[in-house]
């Protein structure tokens, strides 16, 4: 899976270091390896996009290293592969030594895994399951400003799934903890890999059941009901949060217009 890049190799290049992405000119590099001074570097083939290979290279380019969020407006498939590259680069960087015996590890040749020759332990990339839910009450949707979003963006509620918890239980718990309300009629919508740093978002829609909004100030700045045709600043297109909000708006329009 890992090999040395040759002069004629071409495709999309995910050059990553410490969860950063090389973005010369603000774009994901695409083309022949020689044009990006990548010949001779180690590369991992991580997929294909539009008939061309996508490669992950672990390297700090010092200049033009940016965030994956800068390519959020790319096609979802390419964004997903870039996220895969960043997560794999960080996985290999953080698993140089075995967590059980402390001996050096090496990469598997057959799968994305790190192996310990001493104690035979095998490690895989970590994925953190999360829930994200759009809650509707008649013609309004519950939107909140999170403490980590200081840019005025209002979004739906979300949180990590705890050990020994189902996705449905996680929705009920997170909604109650963050807003103080209960929901019903929970429906699965879609999922989205979200490499910030290693989440898998599972998206739901739900209806308001009962309760008054009581904001958890550790998590949220504000939370309120917003009529579907009078919404505040929303998450950018391409995010599953935006998809949930737009789907809820479409349902409200169909019912109230």
From Swiss-Prot:
Free-text cofactor note: Divalent metal cations. Mg(2+) or Mn(2+).
The record's section on SUPFAM superfamilies has:
Nudix
Q: Which residues cross the membrane?
A: none
Supply one GO BP term: NADH metabolic process
Q: Which cofactor does it need?
A: Mg(2+); Mn(2+); Zn(2+)
Residues holding Zn(2+): 98, 101, 116, 119
Q: Which GO terms describe its molecular function?
A: magnesium ion binding; manganese ion binding; NAD+ diphosphatase activity; NADH pyrophosphatase activity; RNA NAD-cap (NMN-forming) hydrolase activity; zinc ion binding
Q: Which Gene3D superfamilies does the UniProt entry name for this protein?
A: 3.90.79.20, Nucleoside Triphosphate Pyrophosphohydrolase
Q: What class of enzyme is it?
A: hydrolase
Which parts of the sequence belong to the Nudix hydrolase domain? 125-248
Q: Which reaction does it catalyse?
A: a 5'-end NAD(+)-phospho-ribonucleoside in mRNA + H2O = a 5'-end phospho-adenosine-phospho-ribonucleoside in mRNA + beta-nicotinamide D-ribonucleotide + 2 H(+); NAD(+) + H2O = beta-nicotinamide D-ribonucleotide + AMP + 2 H(+); NADH + H2O = reduced beta-nicotinamide D-ribonucleotide + AMP + 2 H(+)
This protein's GO CC annotations: cytosol
Q: Where does substrate bind?
A: 69, 111, 124, 192-199, 241
Q: Which InterPro entries match?
A: NAD-cap_RNA_hydrolase_NudC (IPR050241), NudC-like_C (IPR049734), NUDIX_hydrolase-like_dom_sf (IPR015797), NUDIX_hydrolase_CS (IPR020084), NUDIX_hydrolase_dom (IPR000086), RNA_Hydrolase_NudC (IPR022925), Znr_NADH_PPase (IPR015376)
The UniProt keyword set, sorted, is: Hydrolase, Magnesium, Manganese, Metal-binding, NAD, Zinc
The entry marks the following residues as binding a divalent metal cation 2, namely: 174
Q: Name the positions where a divalent metal cation 3 binds.
A: 174, 178, 219
> Where can the motif Nudix box be found?
159-180
Query: What does the entry list as the binding residues for a divalent metal cation 1?
Result: 158, 178, 219
One Pfam family assigned to this protein is NUDIX
Q: What is its EC number?
A: 3.6.1.-, 3.6.1.22
**PANTHER family assigned:** NAD-CAPPED RNA HYDROLASE NUDT12 (PTHR42904:SF6), NUDIX HYDROLASE, NUDC SUBFAMILY (PTHR42904)
Subunit: Homodimer.
Stated family: Belongs to the Nudix hydrolase family. NudC subfamily.
Role noted for this protein:
mRNA decapping enzyme that specifically removes the nicotinamide adenine dinucleotide (NAD) cap from a subset of mRNAs by hydrolyzing the diphosphate linkage to produce nicotinamide mononucleotide (NMN) and 5' monophosphate mRNA. The NAD-cap is present at the 5'-end of some mRNAs and stabilizes RNA against 5'-processing. Has preference for mRNAs with a 5'-end purine. Catalyzes the hydrolysis of a broad range of dinucleotide pyrophosphates.
Name of the featured protein: NAD-capped RNA hydrolase NudC
């Amino acid at each position: 899976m890992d090999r040395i890049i040759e002069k004629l190799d071409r495709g999309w290049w995910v050059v990553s270091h410490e969860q950063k992405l090389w973005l010369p000119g603000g774009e994901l590099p695409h083309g022949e390896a020689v044009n990006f001074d990548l010949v001779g570097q180690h590369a991992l083939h991580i997929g294909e996009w539009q008939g061309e290979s996508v490669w992950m290279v672990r390297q700090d380019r010092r200049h033009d290293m940016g965030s994956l969020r800068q390519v959020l407006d790319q096609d979802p498939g390419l964004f997903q592969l870039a996220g895969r590259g960043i997560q794999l680069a960080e996985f290999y960087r953080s698993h140089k030594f075995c967590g059980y015996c402390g001996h050096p590890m090496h990469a598997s040749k057959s799968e994305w895994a790190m192996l310990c020759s001493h104690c035979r332990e095998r490690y895989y990339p970590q994925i953190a399951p999360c829930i994200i839910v759009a809650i509707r009450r008649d013609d309004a949707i519950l939107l909140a400003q999170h403490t980590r979003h200081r840019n005025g963006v209002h979004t739906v509620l979300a949180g990590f799934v705890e050990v020994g918890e189902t996705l449905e239980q996680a929705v009920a718990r997170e909604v109650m903890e963050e807003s103080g309300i209960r929901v019903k009629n929970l429906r699965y919508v879609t999922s989205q890999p979200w490499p910030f740093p290693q989440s898998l978002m599972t998206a739901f829609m739900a209806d308001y059941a009962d309760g008054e909004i009581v904001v958890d100030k550790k998590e949220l700045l504000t939370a309120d009901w917003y009529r579907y045709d009078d919404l505040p600043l929303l998450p950018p297109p391409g995010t599953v949060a935006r998809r949930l909000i737009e789907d809820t708006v479409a349902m409200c329009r169909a019912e109230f217009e």
